[in-house]
Regions:
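Juxtamembrane "anchor/assembly" segments of surface/extracellular structural proteins
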Residues: 1-68, 83, 103-114, 122, ...
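Short amphipathic alpha-helical segments
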Residues: 29, 55-59, 80, 127, ...
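Exposed loop/turn and edge beta-strand positions of beta-sandwich/beta-sheet ligand-binding modules
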Residues: 82, 101, 156
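Conserved hydrophobic positions within beta-strands
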Residues: 88-90
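Short, solvent-exposed secondary-structure boundary/capping segments
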Residues: 92-107, 188-189
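Charged- and aromatic-enriched interaction segments used to assemble
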Residues: 106-209
């Protein structure tokens, strides 16, 4: 039997959003995760005059998207539950077929906070975790705490961040040291952490969609 998906969205300052028209979460390994959520305007505020004041305050707020599968929610026991935490960056309102309004809420993973103005810095005699902490010092540190799952334990003698965003710099340095640097939907990981095995069976694959694409080469092949 195919399993149902139970979905709940929580935004700071609002009641949980249960009535969802559409939701997509795109999780990339080497880029910021993105989400796109559409809900009926009435699920946020039935009064249209108050609605615009409320949604104007949503940008910058934290959002948590929880979903789990099971034939019945009370029987799922959290055996296949996932959660995504992000930051709202865009909010818009549109009218659908002239009958009702929808609110579109878009955003990204907290790593987007590291992708601001390009910086130029130099670092010396630091291991990767202290280096990361130095890089994020000018950001909202509490939103960028990372788990240390590093294998590379050597100090980096000298490194230059030249006209790079903090995110691009850390991606480059971690790659040079043979380490992973990614967001798993809830926390930033320095290095690879051990996760639980997920088994895909024919009755579950209807709720999952995996895709791959091939992008162009970095340098032209002659």
């Amino acid at each position: 039997m195919a399993e149902r998906i139970f979905l709940e969205v929580n935004i700071d300052g609002l009641d949980p959003l249960i009535s969802i028209r559409s939701l997509s979460v795109q999780q990339s390994i080497f880029a910021h995760h993105k989400f796109d959520l559409v809900v009926p305007s009435a699920s946020i505020e039935p009064d249209n005059e108050k609605l615009f004041d409320i949604i104007a305050e949503l940008v910058g707020k934290d959002i948590t998207i929880d979903w789990e599968t099971g034939t019945f929610k009370e029987n799922s026991q959290g055996t296949d539950a996932s959660s995504f935490k992000g930051i709202i960056t865009d909010v818009s309102v549109y009218n659908e077929r002239g009958n009702y309004m929808n609110v579109r809420i878009q955003g990204a993973s907290p790593t987007i906070l590291m992708d601001g103005v390009p910086n130029t810095n130099s670092f010396s005699e630091l291991k990767l975790k202290p280096l990361y902490e130095s890089v994020i010092a000018s950001n909202l540190v509490n939103k960028l705490q990372a788990e240390d799952n590093l294998s590379y334990a050597e100090k980096i003698p000298f490194s230059i961040q030249y006209n790079e965003t903090d995110f691009n710099y850390m991606c480059r340095i971690m790659h040079q040291c043979g380490e992973w640097f990614y967001y798993d939907g809830q926390t930033i990981s320095l290095g690879v952490k051990t996760g639980k095995e997920l088994k895909l069976t024919p009755d579950r694959t209807g709720s999952l969609h995996f895709g791959f694409n091939l992008s162009g080469p970095v340098a032209q092949v002659r």
